[in-house]
Amino acid sequence: MSLPTVIVLASGRGERFAASGGSTHKLQARLAGKTVLQHTLDAVRASGLPWHLEDGGHPGMGDSIAAAVRTTLLSTPQATGWLILPGDLPLIQSDTLRAVAAALNGHDVAMPIYRGQRGHPVGFSARCGLALLNLKGNQGAALVVRSYTAIELIVNDVGCVTDIDTVDDLRTAERLMHGACGSG
């Protein structure tokens, strides 16, 4: 049985990070000796799931998701689904990726929940493919999530809700990596 593909979104401009004092694009910012994006990709690789990096510079998140789904369908026409993961979640755990992927076996949409907060990746079954292909502009996949029955997975992974939008977010991630704030 084929596995869903993790789509790592890396097309955004990162304007809030620059506005907060960042001297580089947020995905290239250093965190514990590696870039933010490298940490995210390390977790994706460790999950064992197939993946695709979408860094094509599309005008909006919807365009990026649609382009990535289109690309993965060309290489895997019988795709079982997709996990949409922003590239700025450097603390995401590979176990969370696998849990969301497994939940797609019986559900159209699956998303992790950490302490009551919805996180990423959001998983979509193949039934959602056409809706994802039709996304455009700055709107992400929230409308698709609302159009299907979703399962919420309770996870012990602060990384699914720890994105890097500002320099302060980067500092918070650094503290979390070193256990100063705790994650459980």
Regions found by a protein language model. Give the residues of each.
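Conserved alpha/beta core of the MobA/IspD/sugar-nucleotide pyrophosphorylase nucleotidyltransferase superfamily
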Residues: 2-6, 134-184
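Short aromatic/basic micro-patch
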Residues: 30, 91, 123, 163-164
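A general structural signal for well-ordered alpha-helical segments in protein cores
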Residues: 37, 62-65, 97, 129, ...
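Active-site-adjacent beta-strand anchor residues
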Residues: 54-55, 85-86, 122, 135, ...
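Short, solvent-exposed polar/charged micro-motifs at secondary-structure junctions
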Residues: 62, 121, 161-165
